[in-house]
Amino acid sequence: TVRFYSFDEFENKIKATGADFVSCNAFLGELTEKEETGLKNVSTTEMTIQDIRITLSMDAFLDEEFKTFQPDVVYADSVCFWGKLNAWKHNVPLVVSTSTFAFNQMASQYMKNSPKELADMVFGLPKISKELKMLKPYGYKVKNALSLVQSDNKTDSVVYTSERFQPYSESFSDHYVFVGPSVFSKIE
């Protein structure tokens, strides 16, 4: 059985694959206007903080799910931190799905950040670190903020780009499979 934990807007597409759909909408917190604006502007800091808060909101629910369902593997999107965090917490093998490019120290060298993005990262890290500390009493094992976003060479990862297009693809271990983009022809 494949269980897919996601949000209601994806329910029909998930069910169409034959997977069981589990709604996570009830765990979305109320956002302040400032937080919502931060997310709309794709602030990495705000996105990470909200994902950590969703993890805490889902904690009791997912603890029970792991006890009763007992998954063999967690397949989580690279920016779905609650998926990663719960795989680590419950000692379940993790496979990371990366829809664009995989990022490690080598690959991140090609990225050009705007001054605004750099400021968000520099000033955001202390905020993220503060939020991460809130996870420890609940049994979550996380080293630091970078361990959430950066790819490591030990975690099995599916990357939806071609190895030829992946920057510094040679720096990734055999735990990575580059499957190319998912392109579908439009049905008329």
Indicate residue ranges for each PLM-predicted region.
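Short beta-strand element of Class I
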Residues: 2
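Nucleotide-sugar-dependent glycosyltransferase catalytic domains
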Residues: 5-188
